């Protein structure tokens, strides 16, 4: 068994599939949780303030 480049060719499964709620390719097939909207983890849509672009505040 070797590690490195030869082992990378064995990774063929799709980790994420299309989400039923948001439609993005973010639903983890094994964990059954969407990384984008939180489907499978919570009833509410996943949203955080750090994902939004903040307005530029003048420094002087």
UniProtKB/Swiss-Prot annotation:
Single GO molecular-function term?
zinc ion binding
Cofactor(s) in the UniProt record: Zn(2+)
Task: List ligand-binding residues for Zn(2+).
Answer: 19, 22, 34, 37
Against PROSITE patterns, the record matches this protein to: RIBOSOMAL_L37E
Which keywords appear in this protein's UniProt record, sorted alphabetically?
A: Metal-binding, Ribonucleoprotein, Ribosomal protein, RNA-binding, rRNA-binding, Zinc, Zinc-finger
Q: List the disulfide bonds.
A: none
Query: Record keywords: Cytoplasm included?
Result: no
Report if keyword Lipid biosynthesis is assigned: no
Which biological process terms from the Gene Ontology are attached to this UniProt entry?
translation
Give the boundaries of each C4-type zinc finger.
Answer: 19-37
**GO cellular component terms listed in the entry, alphabetical order:** cytosolic large ribosomal subunit
Give the cofactor note.
Binds 1 zinc ion per subunit.
Give the highest taxon in the source lineage: Archaea
One Pfam family name is Ribosomal_L37e
Record family assignment: Belongs to the eukaryotic ribosomal protein eL37 family.
Role description: Binds to the 23S rRNA.
What protein name is recorded for this chain?
Answer: Large ribosomal subunit protein eL37
Q: Which organism is it from?
A: Methanoculleus marisnigri (strain ATCC 35101 / DSM 1498 / JR1)
């Amino acid at each position: 068994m070797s590690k490195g480049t030869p082992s990378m060719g064995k990774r063929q499964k799709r980790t994420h599939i299309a989400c039923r709620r948001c439609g993005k390719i973010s639903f983890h097939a094994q964990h059954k949780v969407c990384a984008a909207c939180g489907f499978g983890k919570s009833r509410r849509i996943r949203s955080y303030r750090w994902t939004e672009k903040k307005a530029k505040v003048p420094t002087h």
